[in-house]
């Protein structure tokens, strides 16, 4: 299982939000490049960089993300607000993978076109949910689409990479949602990245037991409740 630290950017700063709420943010650093290098040095397999301003429509940190990517030797996955082809083209030009959420549900034709242009392995489908139903637009809009129906549909289209977040767990340190993680990981040909709620090394162990492809470390890492080194030791 891969260990992937998250760097969430807002106004050029490294922040964490509580349950995705921009009003409940904690700033951890004014120097995202040094944070990225720190996680790389600690042994991260990949970095998950989220543009929160783009997600909620208040700006863009894409120039900064490009700068961070160019400073690193490990793979970078870019997420947040990638809702049109032009922005996705740009993000893919300097990263290894892009995470697409809202647009994947709103425009499947464009999604297919982008996947065929770059390769399906470069596209990670973000399946964000509350109680098993998909939410989109930076978690502001709920849908009636069941999580597992969505994953199965994307797998049938040729997609294999998924980022699974239970929004009600994100940034809470309350432990991961193992119930839906287990169901998602049971879908054939789906590589699932578990995100949200990780609070300690035991949570990482629980996620690994559900056969997740990778785990995202966020708040627990920034609050020093877990280290990349101990997580790597566990999964190896």
Swiss-Prot record:
<dbReference type="GO" id="GO:0000105">
    <property type="term" value="P:L-histidine biosynthetic process"/>
</dbReference>
<dbReference type="InterPro" id="IPR011060">
    <property type="entry name" value="RibuloseP-bd_barrel"/>
</dbReference>
<dbReference type="InterPro" id="IPR044524">
    <property type="entry name" value="Isoase_HisA-like"/>
</dbReference>
<dbReference type="Pfam" id="PF00977">
    <property type="entry name" value="His_biosynth"/>
</dbReference>
<comment type="pathway">
    <text>Amino-acid biosynthesis; L-histidine biosynthesis; L-histidine from 5-phospho-alpha-D-ribose 1-diphosphate: step 4/9.</text>
</comment>
<comment type="similarity">
    <text>Belongs to the HisA/HisF family.</text>
</comment>
<keyword id="KW-0028">Amino-acid biosynthesis</keyword>
<dbReference type="InterPro" id="IPR023016">
    <property type="entry name" value="Isoase_HisA-like_bact"/>
</dbReference>
<dbReference type="GO" id="GO:0003949">
    <property type="term" value="F:1-(5-phosphoribosyl)-5-[(5-phosphoribosylamino)methylideneamino]imidazole-4-carboxamide isomerase activity"/>
</dbReference>
<keyword id="KW-0368">Histidine biosynthesis</keyword>
<keyword id="KW-0413">Isomerase</keyword>
<dbReference type="InterPro" id="IPR013785">
    <property type="entry name" value="Aldolase_TIM"/>
</dbReference>
<keyword id="KW-0963">Cytoplasm</keyword>
<dbReference type="InterPro" id="IPR006063">
    <property type="entry name" value="HisA_bact_arch"/>
</dbReference>
<dbReference type="InterPro" id="IPR006062">
    <property type="entry name" value="His_biosynth"/>
</dbReference>
<protein>
    <recommendedName>
        <fullName>1-(5-phosphoribosyl)-5-[(5-phosphoribosylamino)methylideneamino] imidazole-4-carboxamide isomerase</fullName>
        <ecNumber>5.3.1.16</ecNumber>
    </recommendedName>
</protein>
<feature type="active site" description="Proton acceptor">
    <location>
        <position position="8"/>
    </location>
</feature>
<feature type="active site" description="Proton donor">
    <location>
        <position position="128"/>
    </location>
</feature>
<dbReference type="GO" id="GO:0005737">
    <property type="term" value="C:cytoplasm"/>
</dbReference>
